[in-house]
Amino acid sequence: MRTLSLLLIWATGTLASDAPRLRALIVDGVNNHDWQAGTRGLRQILEATGRFTVDVSTSPGREAPATAWDAWRPEFDKYDVVINNFNGGHLEDGLRWPAPVEEALLKYLRRGGGLVIFHAANNAFLNWPEYQEIVGLLWREPKFGPGLIVNGQGRVETIPAGEGPKAGHGPRHDFQMEILDPQHPITQGLPAKWLHPSEQLTHGQHGPAEGLKVLTYAYSKDSKRNEPMDWIRRYGRGRVYTTMLGHTWLNEPNPNYDCVGFQTLVARGIEWAATGKVTIATPSELPAPDHAVLRPLGER
């Protein structure tokens, strides 16, 4: 049986009290998931580390008039890291940001900014070519481009374009996360394998699939393959961290956000995207292959 322990505080020494805080901006507003719950959970996780201050820029709604979109201009350059929690759809007619906002994000990244692609945000912007390059692997048809898996020897293997299953997922469930690169600052000190509760395990990602460093993976019962869960890449001088974790759905509990493994991995990934370094320590109690450890975030 899965053992669920409750952690009330981060490990002592996670962050020096006088260390400067990083400025994080979460962008949300449209998503097929419960993006309000996702944004609240992310904010709580980041603020609990003491390393971040967090602002939110919520876009107009899908049916908002052009005047509302014309007035929406997130100021990316004010922040150390931008977290994308926006998904306008994964089809050709998916909702895009206004051209000035897209160009501002590209300039921000090219100049050395940090970007996080959070869960369903990797589904977005099929009709924005630069976005495919930024993310590397996305919710796309097999014909779109190559895919990546982790083979039985722990090596990343390329699946040619046109092959492999379509992007998809089964119902949320507990599954085992595995660390592919234990020496990277984001994953260093985390257990080699740990149980993550009640999460959506996405399979069949495709894209340019170039220049990625896969950090974690999980075995999908649907695709019968080891699927990348977290990865990083560079875009210009900028740093991009993608996590497929963080599923939320309307009128469903989200114990995956209470998972200490998830909280630690995501907070460190966001810090790396912001600075290229990681100072957030691992908590004193960590999950194991057969049990999760939970630190409740409270009502989301």
What is the meaning of each model-derived region?
Residues L6-S17:
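Hydrophobic h-region of N-terminal signal peptides that target proteins for export
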Residues G29-N32, G162-K166, G170-F175, T248-V260:
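Active-site rim elements
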Residues F118-K221, T282-R300:
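An acidic, glycine-rich "communication" segment
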Residues M1-L4:
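Positively charged n-region of N-terminal signal peptides that target proteins for export
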Residues D18-I117, A121-F125:
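Helical hinge/lid and interdomain linker segments adjacent to catalytic or ligand-binding clefts
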